């Protein structure tokens, strides 16, 4: 028997959604106004169309209007970006944006710096060139993730990409408001949905009869909703942070049998609100491939009907599952689904993959994974990343795949073109994975200041300098090649998934962060807060004893996050509190003539001592 939804006092946003005429107003009216920005109601509805209103805090002047601008986020299931779309986005960044593109942690692109008067033009150009911003934000299903690796000889990767795309189509809002607002009612489509998706939309289970939005209803979902599809063992998409995580499972004949389903993950939390927290997804069960669309709709419908619509801080599906327990949630889903859900199948351990460097696709072609610091694609001095990507995509007409770690894969590369692409990247000063610090490889940051309205402090702009400081500390301890997962955010909302990191900095005040420790290198375990308020100037003081303890007490091959989790926070605090840092002793340099150096070295070799020790002994004897 399914539970009964208790009456709720709805939040203001819930009432606004119901009055929006299925996401049309007040955007339609306010687009016709001469103002540079939308009001609060407009801001909320605009999110469903893939845009956030922002202002550049670096440009604020007392007594003057804020520097209003807009971020546009694309929907690109599995991170797929065709050449035509990429070149369009690159041009739009110059014509209407701030001259950069940003790859997100959910395999999509963002354009920043768009003015209100240009929104319609930019969105239309995106849609006309095989892209879309619909449902990239808002209380709906967001961009669906999948492993970015374009393997052609491993069917499980093809299944993951196909189902990610189809589920994105299945859960796209059906209201025509998007096309009415941005394309004057013209429904521009890049292709019809898969027939199985169309059939699933006709399934009445979990859908609202006679509604413009039969799955979402007029209030849409209580909060954002995130889905990823992956293959056994591949955690390139942070499976356990999703509202729904699907794992494709095949048989020995190379056929897709079904999916393990995980539910209830989520990162967002609020400082000093203990009722908000990051959470890992729970296993729900195994669903045959023929039933997966119905199962996904049943899960979404359960969250639609029972998720908290009175308190947006408590509205994600993770809180519903936490409050109910997975057994009760499963029962509610089964009542909509109409079938019992079998236990999950056994899987191999999940490992993090980033697919950087050159890889064979399995069809004679290659793909190249390029590291992108915080996902920001720009030209900066001798580092001409944006120019290099533009030239590669334009010259060879190559598609891209974005990763969940804000990097870019260039794929379908002919073997004979590899050398030319490598040379082009070198000429443009673009570093491949072999040339970057391994800390940078495994680090992520959200944009934060100056444009994100939720940012408390710096993140993207602070991360490069922070990584340099961490590397110096590691070198100080004789760990010059050590690396681990570092993530940084300007607020606690978790956009860069910091609560899965081995070491995370979560903005809590200007130039101040919460320090989180103990996540796993494969992002399968939550980190925990270690220091509540860490001032930027105290980073070395607080991290140094942790790295000293790590160097002294780690097990063979043990990562920093695993070490912190194994020894426990009490031991970490005890060591840190008792640690006395000895400043490095001064080292003096003395020059020697070449003939004297040669004689000293020969004598040192003869005695079996170091050159330094022998030189000190000789000088001391002379001074006596």
Swiss-Prot record:
Name of the molecule in the record: Sulfite reductase [ferredoxin]
Residues binding [4Fe-4S] cluster: 446, 452, 491, 495
GO biological process: sulfate assimilation
Cofactor(s) in the UniProt record: siroheme; [4Fe-4S] cluster
Family classification: Belongs to the nitrite and sulfite reductase 4Fe-4S domain family.
Gene: sir
UniProt-listed PROSITE patterns: NIR_SIR
Chemical reaction(s) catalysed: hydrogen sulfide + 6 oxidized [2Fe-2S]-[ferredoxin] + 3 H2O = sulfite + 6 reduced [2Fe-2S]-[ferredoxin] + 7 H(+)
A Gene Ontology term for the protein's cellular component: sulfite reductase complex (NADPH)
């Amino acid at each position: 028997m399914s539970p009964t939804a208790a009456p709720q006092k709805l939040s203001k946003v819930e009432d606004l959604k119901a009055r929006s005429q299925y996401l049309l107003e007040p955007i339609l009216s306010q687009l016709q106004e001469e103002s540079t920005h939308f009001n609060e109601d407009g801001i909320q509805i605009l999110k469903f169309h893939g845009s956030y209103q922002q202002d550049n805090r670096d440009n604020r002047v007392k007594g003057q209007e804020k520097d209003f601008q807009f971020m546009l986020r694309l929907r690109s299931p599995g991170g797929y970006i065709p050449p035509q779309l990429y070149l369009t986005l690159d041009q739009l960044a110059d014509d209407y944006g701030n001259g950069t593109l940003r790859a997100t942690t959910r395999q999509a692109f963002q354009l920043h710096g768009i003015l209100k008067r240009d929104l319609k033009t930019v969105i239309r150009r995106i849609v006309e060139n095989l892209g879309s911003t619909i449902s990239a934000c808002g209380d709906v299903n967001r961009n669906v993730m999948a492993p970015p690796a374009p393997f052609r000889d491993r069917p499980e990767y093809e299944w993951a990409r196909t189902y990610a795309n189809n589920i994105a189509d299945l859960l796209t809002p059906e209201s025509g408001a998007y096309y009415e607002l941005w394309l004057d009612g013209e429904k521009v489509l890049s292709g019809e949905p898969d027939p199985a998706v169309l059939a699933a939309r006709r399934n009445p289970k979990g859908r609202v009869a006679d509604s413009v939005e039969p799955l979402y209803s007029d209030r849409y979902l209580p909060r954002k909703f995130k889905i990823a599809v992956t293959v056994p063992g591949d955690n390139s998409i942070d499976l356990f942070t999703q509202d729904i995580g699907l794992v494709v499972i095949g048989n020995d004949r190379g056929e897709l049998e079904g999916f393990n389903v995980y539910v209830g993950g989520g990162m967002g939390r609020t400082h000093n609100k203990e009722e908000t927290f990051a959470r890992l997804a729970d296993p729900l069960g195994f669903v045959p491939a023929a039933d997966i669309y119905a199962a996904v709709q049943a899960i979404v419908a359960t969250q639609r009907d029972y998720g908290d619509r009175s308190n947006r801080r408590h509205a994600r599906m993770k809180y519903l599952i936490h409050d109910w327990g997975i057994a009760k949630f499963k029962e509610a889903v089964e009542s909509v689904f109409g079938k019992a859900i079998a236990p999950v199948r056994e899987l191999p351990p999940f490992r993090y993959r980033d697919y950087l460097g050159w890889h064979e696709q399995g069809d004679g072609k290659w793909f190249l994974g390029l590291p992108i610091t915080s996902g920001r694609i720009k030209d900066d001095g001798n580092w001409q990343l944006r120019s290099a990507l533009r030239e590669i995509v334009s010259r060879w007409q190559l598609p891209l795949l974005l990763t969940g770690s804000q990097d870019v894969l260039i794929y379908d590369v002919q073997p004979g073109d590899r050398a030319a692409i490598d040379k082009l990247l070198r000429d443009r000063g673009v570093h491949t994975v072999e040339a970057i610090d391994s800390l940078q490889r495994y680090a992520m940051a959200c944009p934060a200041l100056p444009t994100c309205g939720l940012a408390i402090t710096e993140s993207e702009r602070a991360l490069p300098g922070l990584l340099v400081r961490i590397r110096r500390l590691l070198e100080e301890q004789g760990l010059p090649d050590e690396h681990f997962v570092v993530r940084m955010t300007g607020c606690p909302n978790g956009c860069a998934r910091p609560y899965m990191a081995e070491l995370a900095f979560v903005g809590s005040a200007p130039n101040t962060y919460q320090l989180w420790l103990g996540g796993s290198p494969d992002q399968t375990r939550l980190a925990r807060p270690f220091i509540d308020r860490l001032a930027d100037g105290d980073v070395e003081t607080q991290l140094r004893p942790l790295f000293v303890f790590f160097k002294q007490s780690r097990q063979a091959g043990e990562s920093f996050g695993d070490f912190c989790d194994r020894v426990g926070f009490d031991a970490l605090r005890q060591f840190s509190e008792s640690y006395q840092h000895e400043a490095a002793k001064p080292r003096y340099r003395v020059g020697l003539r070449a003939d004297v150096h040669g004689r000293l070295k020969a004598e040192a070799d003869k005695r079996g001592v170091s050159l330094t020790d022998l030189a000190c002994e000789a000088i001391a004897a002379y001074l006596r």
